[in-house]
Curated annotation (Swiss-Prot):
Organism: Parabacteroides distasonis (strain ATCC 8503 / DSM 20701 / CIP 104284 / JCM 5825 / NCTC 11152)
Gene3D superfamilies tied to this protein: Ribosomal protein L9, C-terminal domain, Ribosomal protein L9, N-terminal domain
Family listed: Belongs to the bacterial ribosomal protein bL9 family.
Keywords attached to this entry: Ribonucleoprotein, Ribosomal protein, RNA-binding, rRNA-binding
Organism superkingdom: Bacteria
PANTHER family for this protein: 50S RIBOSOMAL PROTEIN L9 (PTHR21368)
GO cellular component terms, semicolon-separated: ribonucleoprotein complex; ribosome
UniProt cross-references to HAMAP family, sorted A to Z: Ribosomal_bL9
Protein name (Swiss-Prot/TrEMBL): Large ribosomal subunit protein bL9
Disulfide pattern: none
Task performed by this protein: Binds to the 23S rRNA.
Amino acid sequence: MQVILKEDVVNLGYKDDIVTVKDGYGRNFLIPTGKAVIASESAKKVLAENLKQRAHKLAKIKEDAQTLAAKLEGVALTIGAKTSSTGTIFGSVTNIQVAEALAKAGFENIDRKIIYIKESVKEVGSYKAVLKLHKEVSVEVPFEVVSE
């Protein structure tokens, strides 16, 4: 029996895969629990159309991410932090402060969850943050930490 998976199933396949399973497993478990549907010709056509639309959407999202990455290439950020007389920051600079600096620079729609700082920022100096805009598109943004 061939079925189309509606969600990921461990040791069987991923969402939208067409897999062959034993009749009992398909009829008694996968279909009643909503994890799969029977792979009829009409269901295969609907799946093909959905995959085509999803691929188009994903291409648009990737294109938007590449456009944003090109805009972010020339951006240099300055982040102010309270420091001691030796240049050590009270606390540390995190992705939240980088997101706020990006918002001030005109990039309000960048979420802090996509910003990764490789090293701990606890002193005044120059650092780099990596923005993972898409699974295939990331950009490195330099930022300077200065004393307030």
